A protein has these predicted regions:
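Secondary-structure capping and boundary motifs in well-ordered enzyme cores
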Residues: 4, 31, 94-99, 127
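Loop/helix-junction capping segments adjacent to catalytic residues or to phosphate/diphosphate-binding pockets
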Residues: 33, 84, 100
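Short amphipathic alpha-helical segments and their helix-coil junctions
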Residues: 20, 24, 71-84
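Hydrophobic side chains within alpha-helical segments
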Residues: 8-11, 41, 103, 134
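ATP/Mg2+ or Mg2+-diphosphate-binding catalytic cores
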Residues: 100-167
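Active-site acidic catalytic loop and adjacent metal/ATP-binding pocket
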Residues: 1-37, 50
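All-alpha amphipathic helical-bundle segments outside canonical DNA-binding/catalytic cores
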Residues: 82-94
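Active-site activation/catalytic loop segments of kinase-like enzymes and analogous catalytic loops
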Residues: 36-79, 96-115
Length: 167
């Protein structure tokens, strides 16, 4: 499959005056890859209430209601691409990607901030902590998130003109 490779919220173009995404930008990362990686990363980024550089906040860091809303839109537009095996692993993929990114930020901090651009001291260390908190938030909510996902895909939906996957 062809994936975007960096589907974070900053790479989603939103229509002016509307609450609707119209395009993904920053296409230099388009490549063959796994749908779960792309969709998991998109959900990790878009459902993080604080963003990668966020400060302390109240409540769960991972927004379950955004997770459900984003997946409802995905289901209606391209849900046929997400097979049963993908759905079974989707929440786990979001959690795994948050942990992976936390490790990448932490490693970059230890290496002298060579990969991710920083504007202040210890910014990548802070970013790592945010991703690890996000990981913990997803873990605490894993069962309810899986229930939301199952409920969304149990409903009937309009047919998609997308190519079918073999899963």
């Amino acid at each position: 499959e062809v994936i975007h490779g960096d589907p974070k919220s900053a790479n989603v173009l939103v229509a002016a005056g509307e609450n609707r995404a119209i395009a993904l930008i920053d296409l230099d990362t388009v490549k063959p890859g796994l749908l779960l990686h792309d969709l998991g990363d998109c959900l990790r980024s878009c459902c993080n209430r604080l963003g990668e550089d966020g400060e302390e906040g109240e409540g769960e860091l991972f927004a379950a209601e955004l997770f459900q809303a984003l997946l409802a839109g995905y289901r209606d537009a391209a849900g046929d691409l997400l097979g049963m095996a993908d759905r079974a692993l989707l929440v786990e993929s979001v959690r795994l990607i948050s942990y992976e990114l936390g490790l990448r930020f932490f490693t970059d901090h230890l290496a002298g901030d060579r990969y991710f651009t920083v504007t202040r001291p210890a910014q990548n260390l802070h970013r790592a902590a945010v991703q690890f908190r996000l990981h913990a938030s997803i873990l605490r909510q894993q069962e309810p998130l899986e229930e939301r996902l199952a409920h969304l895909f149990a409903r009937t939906r309009p047919p998609c003109n997308c190519p079918r996957r073999g899963l």
